[in-house]
Structures are given as C-alpha cells and as structure tokens.
Amino acid sequence: MSKKVLITSRSFGKISNEPLDILTGAGFEVTMKGKDFDQAEFEAMIPDYDALIIGAHEFPEAVMERCPKLKIICKHGAGLDNIHLEKAKELGIAVCNVPGTNSNAVADLTFGLMLAVARNIVSTNRWVHEGRWQTAIGVDVCG
C-alpha cells in the first residue's frame, strides 16, 4: 500500500512538475488540493494521509490529534506559524520547512515597492486610467 501525501499549498508544482514527479516516482499517492480548498474540507481529509505539504491553511492542535497516520508535515514556505509545533513533537510528527527559498523573490518585491513609492507609480497609473496626465515628482533611489 502506497503512502498518501496531501498537498494544500496553492503554489506547489506551479512552476515545474518535477516535485510532483519525484513524489509519484517514489511511489507516493499524491492529492493536490490547493485551489478553492477551505479549512473544513482540509480538516475532514487530513486524517487519511501519511504526509502533508501545507501552505497557509491552519493546522490546529485538535485536528492534529485526529491524524494517527500522519508522520511528517512540510511547510511549503518559510514560516511555521500555522502549525502547532509542540503538539506535532508530542505526537511524533516531524515538521520541516524551506527557509530562505523565497529570499530573492522577497528582495525583488521589496525593491519594486521602493521604486513604486519613490516614483509615485501607483498614483500616476491611476491618473492615466482616469484620463488625466499630470506630472508627479519622485525621488531617486540610490545608496
């Protein structure tokens, strides 16, 4: 009997099928439930799974207690604030995450937001869509 993996992260496998191919190639039965997936459905499904790759869904202590088959929770992201770590440890469920994997994307977004503020991009975009053409004086980003 194959091990069952539930994936609730909306972005898991979006850029490449390689992560899914690795799991299925290793004999795992994979269920993807990222899009249009609510908390109640998650709580009803999870007791049947051996492994969980979780996104932003909350994984309350009470739900974790109803998961006798669950052996590992992997957070598809950096933060672990939606997983009750002490309860997982008590139940012998391993927990892991992927810290730092989004650091380039965070830096890119931060720089983009800095440019948007410095150059009034949001305001000037709105003005153009409203049919107005006005000049907004921005500041240089340097240093």
Where are these predicted regions, by residue range?
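An N-terminal-biased, well-structured beta-alpha scaffold segment characteristic
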Residues: 1-96
